[in-house]
């Protein structure tokens, strides 16, 4: 699979086969992540793999949103009016816990920070944050080339505090998201994407 095929194949799914991802495959995916550009050339990234169900149960402080009315109220509160966008959230919210607990591989990526992430002194202060997301995108594309799909989820503040205790990571490292990767279930739902043309997004010389 070439890079363009992997880009087309990469999709977000939240329903997985009951099948673990082999460590050799995980290492290849992380190695692809480590090939991403990095702001300081040091690639100060670390990865915690959590594949045991008991360990995941102890780690995760996430709940599925099972109430459709609650979900609709949340979307209204966000001011979402696009139906494709709303459908994405309707798909996601009831699976917030299950997509992480039942995945074939749960990866917790970490990156080293120089100053508090939510109190940057300048745009350049976010270079570390930008670099780890380049790494994560490489990993998602590598996973797609392996026949794996998945989802990322950004933790809430209370989740991050619990993860710090559960995993024991250093104070100067931050987890930007959970990465759940696995083999798609046969009935895995794949929400429709908005069709967007590159030509409509390109501006020559001026906006």
Predicted regions mapped to residue ranges:
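C-terminal helix-cap and adjacent tail motif
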Residues: 6-12, 174-207
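Short, electropositive alpha-helical surface patch
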Residues: 161-175
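Glycine-rich, charged/polar anion/phosphate-binding loops
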Residues: 31-35, 90-95, 163-166, 188
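Glycine-rich phosphate/pyrophosphate-binding beta-alpha loops
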Residues: 37-42
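Glycine/small-residue-rich phosphate/adenosyl-binding loop
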Residues: 49-131
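Small-aliphatic-rich amphipathic alpha-helix that forms the alpha element of a beta-alpha
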Residues: 28, 33, 105-109, 113-165
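A short N-terminal beta-strand-loop micro-motif at the entrance of redox/enzyme domains
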Residues: 13-28
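Short, surface-exposed beta-edge/turn micro-motifs
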Residues: 44-45, 103-106, 175-176
